[in-house]
Amino acid sequence: MWDKAHGGIVHVKSQGTVNHPLFKIEWIKKKNELFTKGKVALDGNFWIVNTLETEKGILAFIHVENAEGSGIAGGAGKSRIGLGWSDDNGDTFTFLGHIIVPFNDPDPYNIQGAPYIVKNKYIYIYFHDTTGLTVARAPLAEVISAAQMGNTSPWMKYDGQERGFNSNGAGGASTRIGIDGISHTDAACSTYNNKCYLLLTRMNWKGKDTWVNLYESVDGVRWKFSKTIVQMSASQVETGYQYATIVNEDGSDNGVVGSKFFIYCNKDHQKNGRRTYKWTVDLAR
């Protein structure tokens, strides 16, 4: 998160309930205080945008801006998706390196991301390449094994129905998956109906409505619209809904839900009056 009181970009660990998710702040750390291990340089500005908890540790998906010293103050510069690994319950992380680089590596460019799902022993992550919203994947076992050793494993971008997942995650070409919106969000697969769900949002850019939409898929590649969670006109430009997450009914946030789950999303996150809203999705109805 960005916090002027703590000198800029910081990372926060909190505890709470489904009704009060930020009830208790455990700690606030800067990048060098959180990423204390590893052999890869801490290049750029880091935001942990999602985590996957496993029996062996916690895998963090990191949105990286200003990679390779690129960009100007307030700009994204070159952007990446990176990985981190924690074996102490998220109190410190090893930065493993970058796994996704946009095609042709434009500067500036915002890759957004990174919702993920686990499907058929693969991890799928979603991000914006230069073609639009797309997906890359890697075998779960390989990702975790490499992470434990302080490394990354190869990820492959989706490059169309004929070629499939056959393009290098680190700069290869990709094909958009046909839906769009801001992808600083979350995804999960349901044990109730074996479908997966992906959130996308939009703020009030150029006077358009702000919204949170839910999409569904059976394979992680072909997505269709499921429902609008909220849609409204925003009072000012650059206001509205952004940064959404999916939480299971039992309070877990690990890419798996049952028949009922909660959606949380910030509104007007750049304003003093920002708030977090909560909605319930019941797949049995």
Regions found by a protein language model. Give the residues of each.
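Beta-rich carbohydrate-recognition and catalytic domains
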Residues: 1-44, 52-107, 119-180, 190-237, ...
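Conserved beta-strand position repeated once per blade in WD40 beta-propeller domains
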Residues: 48-50, 113-116, 184-186, 243-245
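A short, acidic, amphipathic alpha-helical segment used as a generic capping/interface helix at domain edges
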Residues: 240, 245-251
